[in-house]
């Protein structure tokens, strides 16, 4: 019965079922393991039991392994693993802070520089967050030239249905890191002013009476809550900030539908972007070539070449339906048309023009105007994104250590 429960909980992830072990654990490479959370007590009945994980690692890689815990929401007794545990935490169903990725890759690189060492990387389910960081490392090591190839490879090896990293914002951050590597860029948080948001086509919440509201987060702090309703035009909605909102680094925008004051908010979608990757008019000639980034041919959801004469003064980013967390799962087009798009409009700040050392750690002012529960930790456990493109299975048999 326990084996059946474990199989059900791990869903389509590949399990390690050899030598008397039955663990939600996969060798992505001979020296890189992706696994589910090593749990204790009752949770250990249906997830990886921490004692079984210790026994496995001691029997296979004694004194040559290190655990990487990506969970922000939970911990365990690191003494079980002789304190060989590093923590690079970020929230479930969210991407990591961009500045977390490079130190993780450098840490992993140092560990694996010794031939016998093995890294065991986990989040809660050992799929999404784990996949983001493993894919970033594979790009860091030059194992794949493009983010899409690393994501496809991970999805094929870790799961039976090729759905590894499926959340759009998490995938976006793998592309971000790929772009930095490809162009030998040093990341720095870029301060911008956020002016407005535009919907192309109207979402179909409550029929034609959709009433979207939104919040903006930075550094896990809610910095803006919309109060005024959107402006409407044929097949368009506009959301203007009362005054330009200063943002820098990783930001999250979350949309809700609220029909009236009595009804509860209904989650529509959310997304994460980083201000470093939002281009201005003068940057298009360098960064965009035939609608794609120079040096990276598959960066959907990072740059858009759509620009009207009225928008020339703005730095513009367009996100399609498939680039939006939660909206991308509306396969039947019940709530969003297939052409639904969100456009974001920014300008550079005086600080950005004069100070290249700006940091996302700059203090932010919390917005407490709505007195409503903070939805930052929103979790949707029913995630299922579009399947990745087919992967060449011949590559699986040719894997060597990273």
From Swiss-Prot:
InterPro entries (alphabetical): Bifunc_PIno_P3_Pase/Pase_PTEN, C2_domain_sf, Dual-spec_lipid-protein_phosph, Prot-tyrosine_phosphatase-like, PTP_PTEN, Tensin_C2-dom, Tensin_phosphatase, Tyr_Pase_AS
Primary subcellular site in the record, as a coarse category: cytoplasm
Region named Disordered: 354-402
First-level EC class: hydrolase
Catalytic activity field: a 1,2-diacyl-sn-glycero-3-phospho-(1D-myo-inositol-3,4,5-trisphosphate) + H2O = a 1,2-diacyl-sn-glycero-3-phospho-(1D-myo-inositol-4,5-bisphosphate) + phosphate; O-phospho-L-seryl-[protein] + H2O = L-seryl-[protein] + phosphate; O-phospho-L-threonyl-[protein] + H2O = L-threonyl-[protein] + phosphate; O-phospho-L-tyrosyl-[protein] + H2O = L-tyrosyl-[protein] + phosphate
Phosphatase tensin-type domain residues: 14-184
Keywords, in A-Z order: Apoptosis, Cell projection, Cytoplasm, Hydrolase, Lipid metabolism, Lipid-binding, Neurogenesis, Nucleus, Protein phosphatase, Synapse, Tumor suppressor, Ubl conjugation
The C2 tensin-type domain, residue ranges: 189-349
Protein name: Phosphatidylinositol 3,4,5-trisphosphate 3-phosphatase and dual-specificity protein phosphatase PTEN
Subcellular location: Cytoplasm; Nucleus; Nucleus, PML body; Cell projection, Dendritic spine
GO terms, molecular function: inositol-1,3,4,5,6-pentakisphosphate 3-phosphatase activity; inositol-1,3,4,5-tetrakisphosphate 3-phosphatase activity; lipid binding; PDZ domain binding; phosphatidylinositol-3,4,5-trisphosphate 3-phosphatase activity; phosphatidylinositol-3,4-bisphosphate 3-phosphatase activity; phosphatidylinositol-3-phosphate phosphatase activity; protein serine/threonine phosphatase activity
A UniProt-annotated Pfam family: PTEN_C2
Composition bias, Acidic residues: 382-395
List of catalytic residues: 123
Motif PDZ-binding: where in chain: 400-402
Post-translational modification (record): Monoubiquitinated. Deubiquitinated.
Family, per entry: Belongs to the PTEN phosphatase protein family.
The protein's Enzyme Commission number: 3.1.3.16, 3.1.3.48, 3.1.3.67, 3.1.3.-
Compositionally biased spans, kind Low complexity: 354-368
GO cellular component: cell projection; cytoplasm; cytosol; dendritic spine; nucleus; plasma membrane; PML body; postsynaptic density
Database matches in Gene3D superfamilies: 2.60.40.1110, Protein tyrosine phosphatase superfamily (3.90.190.10)
Cofactor list: Mg(2+)
Subunit-structure text: Monomer.
GO process terms (BP): apoptotic process; cell motility; negative regulation of cell migration; negative regulation of cell population proliferation; negative regulation of focal adhesion assembly; negative regulation of phosphatidylinositol 3-kinase/protein kinase B signal transduction; nervous system development; phosphatidylinositol 3-kinase/protein kinase B signal transduction
Function: Dual-specificity protein phosphatase, dephosphorylating tyrosine-, serine- and threonine-phosphorylated proteins. Also functions as a lipid phosphatase, removing the phosphate in the D3 position of the inositol ring of PtdIns(3,4,5)P3/phosphatidylinositol 3,4,5-trisphosphate, PtdIns(3,4)P2/phosphatidylinositol 3,4-diphosphate and PtdIns3P/phosphatidylinositol 3-phosphate with a preference for PtdIns(3,4,5)P3.
């Amino acid at each position: 019965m326990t084996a059946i429960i474990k199989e059900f909980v791990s869903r389509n992830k590949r399990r390690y079922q050899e030598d008397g072990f039955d663990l939600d654990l996969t060798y992505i490479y001979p020296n890189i393991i992706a696994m589910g959370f090593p749990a204790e007590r009752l949770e250990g009945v249906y997830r990886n039991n921490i004692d079984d994980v210790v026994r496995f690692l001691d029997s296979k890689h004694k004194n040559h392994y290190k655990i990487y815990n990506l969970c922000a929401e939970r911990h365990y007794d690191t003494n079980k693993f002789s304190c060989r545990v590093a923590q690079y935490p970020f929230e479930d169903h969210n991407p990591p802070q961009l500045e977390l990725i490079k130190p993780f890759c450098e840490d992993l690189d140092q560990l694996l520089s010794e031939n016998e060492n093995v890294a065991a990387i986990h989040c809660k389910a050992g799929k999404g967050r784990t996949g983001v960081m493993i894919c970033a490392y594979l790009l860091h090591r030059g194992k794949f030239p493009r983010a899409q190839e690393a994501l496809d490879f991970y999805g094929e090896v870790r799961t039976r249905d090729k759905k590894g990293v499926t959340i759009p914002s998490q995938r976006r951050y793998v592309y971000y890191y790929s772009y930095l590597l490809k162009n030998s860029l040093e990341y720095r948080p870029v301060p911008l002013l956020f002016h407005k948001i535009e919907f192309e086509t109207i979402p179909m919440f409550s029929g034609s009476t959709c009433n979207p509201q939104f919040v903006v987060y930075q550094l896990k702090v809610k910095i803006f809550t919309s109060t005024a309703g959107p402006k409407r035009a044929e097949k368009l909605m506009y959301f203007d900030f009362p005054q330009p909102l200063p943002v820098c680094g990783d930001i999250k925008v979350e949309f809700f539908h609220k029909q009236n004051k009595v009804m509860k908010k209904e989650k529509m979608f959310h997304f994460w972007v980083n201000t470093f990757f939002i281009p201005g008019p003068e940057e298009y000639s360098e960064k965009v070539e035939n609608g794609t980034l120079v040096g990276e041919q598959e960066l959907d959801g990072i740059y858009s070449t759509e620009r009207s004469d009225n928008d020339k003064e703005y730095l513009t980013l367009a996100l399609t339906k498939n680039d939006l967390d939660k909206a991308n799962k509306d396969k039947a087009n019940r709530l969003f048309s297939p052409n639904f798009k969100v456009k974001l409009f920014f300008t550079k700040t005086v600080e950005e023009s004069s100070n290249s050392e700006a940091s996302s750690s700059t203090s932010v002012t919390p917005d407490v105007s709505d007195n409503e529960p903070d939805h930052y930790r929103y979790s949707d456990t029913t995630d299922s994104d579009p399947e990745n493109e087919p992967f060449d299975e011949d590559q699986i048999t040719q894997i060597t250590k990273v």
